Amino acid sequence: MKPLNRICVIGAGAWGTALAGVAARAGREVTLYARDAAAAAQISATRDNPRLPGIPLDRGIVVTHDIAAAGSSDIVIIAAPAQHSRTAITTLAPHLSPGTPVIASAKGIEHGTRRFMTEVIEEAAPHAVPAILSGPSFADDVARGLPTAVTLAAKDEALAIALVHALGSAAFRPYHTTDVRGVEIGGAAKNVLAIAAGIVVGKQLGASALAALTTRGFSELVRLGCACGGRGETLAGLSGLGDLILTCSSPQSRNFSLGIALGRGDPAPRDKLSEGAHTAPALLELAAARDVEMPVAQAVAAILAGRLTIDGAIDNLLTRPFRGEG
């Protein structure tokens, strides 16, 4: 396998900028692509991204508005939101060399197609080799170089290992797997479940209710993950349980914050993207196609769509028939 030294990150938001820093700390040659030319020029000149205030950009990172720069990269990381990833990959595709690893880092399912991010890569750039990076990680923590562990999955184990070595450092610890689908299910489902956890906190239902909701939500994640071919150890690992714990317990999570606002009866934050809000209907369509019951996720989707009040959703969940745990 050829050396994987040149890395291009597509998307200069908080997460993309943090991942560019990860690659730079791993000793790679890094290019950060910004769709907006003015933003690229500003970040390049000031070495500061307003999305990550107070965290200077590594001097070795080249910031560009030229998408063709990705064509000379050994690895491309897609840091666009899940619902915009196809557009980013389609724009990138003509500039990619055949066989280039393209790592998705968004956690979601494409609305309307029910495609996971690696499937979007396969369709939009069929000559690329898809991989997925996911796990308990906030952009601010990663950008500051705080200790973080994630999962990196590719169907080819040798490639997954090579990608881990290309991005890993003392502060950023990827674990490799070939269970691509398990990793993707964990990342997508936990965002929806985090909204439910936030609602519990916003409604002040107590720590016991939060623990119960998180645990039962994890059961839903595992059921769907296994039905889609994911492995139990992946779902119970960093990209499943680990990410669920983080996202259901920290206000840094946009999905958790959305749930808190909903539970309090406050307007939803308009300046923060919640992947879970977009993923919820696609997740339920996927579950229905595999005859998997997901009552917590279903409640979230109904609340977001205005089909059910929060009090009605809580009542529905608390009056379900008693059953064995599992």
Curated annotation (Swiss-Prot):
Pathway: Membrane lipid metabolism; glycerophospholipid metabolism. Sn-glycerol 3-phosphate binds at residues 107, 135, 137, 190, 243, 253-255. The keyword Ubl conjugation does not apply. Keywords: Cytoplasm, Lipid biosynthesis, Lipid metabolism, NAD, NADP, Nucleotide-binding, Oxidoreductase, Phospholipid biosynthesis, Phospholipid metabolism. It catalyses: sn-glycerol 3-phosphate + NAD(+) = dihydroxyacetone phosphate + NADH + H(+); sn-glycerol 3-phosphate + NADP(+) = dihydroxyacetone phosphate + NADPH + H(+). NADPH binds at residues 15, 35, 107, 139, 254, 273, 275. One of its GO terms (cellular component) is cytosol. It is found in: Cytoplasm. The keyword Methyltransferase does not apply. InterPro entries: 6-PGluconate_DH-like_C_sf, 6PGD_dom2, G3P_DH_NAD-dep, G3P_DH_NAD-dep_C, G3P_DH_NAD-dep_N, NAD(P)-bd_dom_sf. The active site is at 190 (proton acceptor). Belongs to the NAD-dependent glycerol-3-phosphate dehydrogenase family. PANTHER family: GLYCEROL-3-PHOSPHATE DEHYDROGENASE, GLYCEROL-3-PHOSPHATE DEHYDROGENASE [NAD(+)] 2, CHLOROPLASTIC. This is Glycerol-3-phosphate dehydrogenase [NAD(P)+]. It comes from Nitrobacter winogradskyi (strain ATCC 25391 / DSM 10237 / CIP 104748 / NCIMB 11846 / Nb-255).
